[in-house]
Each structure stands twice: as C-alpha cells, then as structure tokens.
C-alpha cells in the first residue's frame, strides 16, 4: 500500500473537523488564523541514510530535508524540534559533538532555532524532526497547475 493510499484509508477521516490538517495531503499543518505551519518527518537508519559513520552529514541531510517541506510551501522555517532514538554506540561523545556542531552550522545557515526534542534508548537508530514556520499563505500541492517544463 502506498503512503497516500494508507493515509486516506486509515487516517484522513480523523482530521475532518480540522481544515488546518489539509486532509493530510500537503505534508504540512497550516492554521491560517495563527499563520502557523508545522511539518514532521522521521528518518530511519537503513531507510533514509545508509550508515552513521559520518553523523555530521546525516544530521545536515535530515535537517535540510525537513525544512524543505516548509520551503516548498513558500514558508520560512523558524524552529525545529529534534528527537533521536539510538544507543550509546551511536550516541557516543564524539558523535554527539559532531551532531551538535552540525546543528549549529545548519541553524546559522538557515536562521532556525532548536525548540526542543527528545531522546530514547533503542537499538534502531532514528530521528524525527518537527519544523515550524509562520506564513499568511502556503503553496498547495493539489492546487498547483500542471505546466510543461522544457530543458
């Protein structure tokens, strides 16, 4: 079953009272009255990155991928929340220093701020990033007009 098929079949009915959820078809939550835009992404070792030998590069990839959900909606990201699950082998002192340094670089590059997060002990390495931005409007996927592009 494909992602949107799964969402439509099992979860979209849970959002019927909330226009802000956009029927779960836009990869973001958009509350017009508060100008609030939120997106959540999860990254799992073996699915979204091959290994964690270069944690600094993995962290940059997941931050950039996560903020791109807002950027493609024409929303400037402001805050992000980072949760990580892993064990002491991957979250050792050396890796944590590299992760912290990469996060600082990404924050400076994209003018974003870490708002919080969580850590969980697990044998399976994964990260979840929630991004938050503010905007009067967004670009909707399902309202985009198909245009031919020639290269």
What are these regions (language model features)?
Residues 43, 76-151:
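Glycine-rich anion-binding loops of enzyme active sites
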């Amino acid at each position: 079953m494909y992602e949107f098929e799964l969402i439509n079949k099992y979860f979209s009915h849970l959002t019927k009272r909330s226009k802000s959820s956009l029927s779960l078809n836009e990869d973001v939550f958009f509350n017009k009255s508060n100008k609030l835009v939120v997106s959540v992404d999860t990254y799992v070792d073996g699915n979204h990155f091959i290994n964690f030998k270069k944690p600094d590069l993995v962290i940059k990839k997941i931050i950039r991928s996560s903020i791109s959900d807002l950027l493609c909606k024409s929303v400037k990201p402001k805050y992000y929340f980072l949760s990580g699950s892993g064990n002491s082998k991957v979250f050792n002192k050396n890796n944590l220093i590299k992760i912290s340094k990469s996060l600082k670089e990404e924050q400076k590059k994209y003018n974003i701020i870490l708002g919080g997060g969580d850590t969980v002990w697990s044998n399976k390495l994964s990260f979840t990033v929630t991004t938050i931005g503010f905007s009067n409007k967004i670009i909707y996927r399902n309202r985009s007009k198909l245009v031919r592009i020639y290269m």
